[in-house]
Amino acid sequence: MSAAGEEDKKPAGGEGGGAHINLKVKGQDGNEVFFRIKRSTQLKKLMNAYCDRQSVDMNAIAFLFDGRRLRGEQTPDELEMEDGDEIDAMLHQTGGCLPA
């Protein structure tokens, strides 16, 4: 768990800018990790932090928001994320085809 509640909340000067957003990343195992980032911060920062915390390679995880895969250069503002939104972290699977 992060120390999201310890930071002073700054007044939001409109949408975006320096405003922070609280996001939840939920793994396939049900484990939830909370992050507090600026709305203008690229999501790759959150993705790297999640992978480091879970000891997983960044290329082994697909991050999804509303069923769409996230790219590292996207920001919460671009995706119109709201405080408390959930990002799904899914392990890549290869194969899935059975021999005939």
Curated annotation (Swiss-Prot):
There is a cross-link at residue 96 (Glycyl lysine isopeptide (Gly-Lys) (interchain with K-? in acceptor proteins)). Residues 1-12 have a biased composition (Basic and acidic residues). It comes from the Eukaryota. One of its GO terms (biological process) is protein sumoylation. SUPFAM superfamilies: Ubiquitin-like. Residues 1-23 are annotated as: Disordered. PANTHER family: SMALL UBIQUITIN-RELATED MODIFIER (PTHR10562). Ubiquitin-like protein which can be covalently attached to target lysines as a monomer. Does not seem to be involved in protein degradation and may function as an antagonist of ubiquitin in the degradation process. This is Small ubiquitin-related modifier 1. The gene is SUMO1.
